[in-house]
Amino acid sequence: LLAWGLTLGLAVGIVSAQDKLFSELVGPGSVGAVKAGGALQVPFIIWGGDMATFYANGGLKTKSGSIFQKQGLNLNLTPGDDFIQQVRDYRSGKSPFLRGTYRMMGQASEVIGSDPRTKGVMIMQMTWSAGDHMVAREDVKTVTDLKGKTVAVQQGGPHIGMLDDVLKTAQLDWSDITVKYFSELTGDGSPVEAFRAEGSTISACFAVTPDMFGLCTDLNG
């Protein structure tokens, strides 16, 4: 995963495939400067690699004697799985950082690339590790079976690009499926919970590894 601002054109097809442009999801807002002094707001995400971040910081706020404190850092770690809100916070100056995948940054480029004050620079790639899955019902034997089906995914999240890759692999277009977007990555209001719901018409959903295990355990009885 990445901490940075702008990538150029990595997800033009993905952005146009959503029901709304990413800029419409983010909405209007003014560009603000990051306040000098005090703790820097850094978003964290549901990702195993962030264990190192929490360990080095000593928790959500930089703890005295922690690795980051000894390096002169003062950080406030805040939830960042709502990437649309992350971009709003970045634009307004609440945080100088964006956290996400390459494809998520491609979506954000529409917003942050529109003003020279918010154009970002990639400063770190944290991990290459996997942890994302598409879980499907029994009638979806191959990815080509997704045609005509309903697929659930978090809007603006890390799985938009993965869904795009799956469709390309199956030689399908976004118009070949019905996409249901959800605000949360996991828990209430997420694709996983919608997929799990009794009587759900969703044929496939995207999930992080713990949710995938939960779904597959349920499906196998």
Label for each model-derived stretch:
Residues 12-17:
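Sec/Tat signal peptide C-region and signal peptidase I cleavage site
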Residues 1-2, 56:
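Composition- and surface-driven signal marking solvent-exposed, interaction-prone regions
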Residues 18-216, 220-221:
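Short, glycine-/small- and polar/acidic-enriched structural segments
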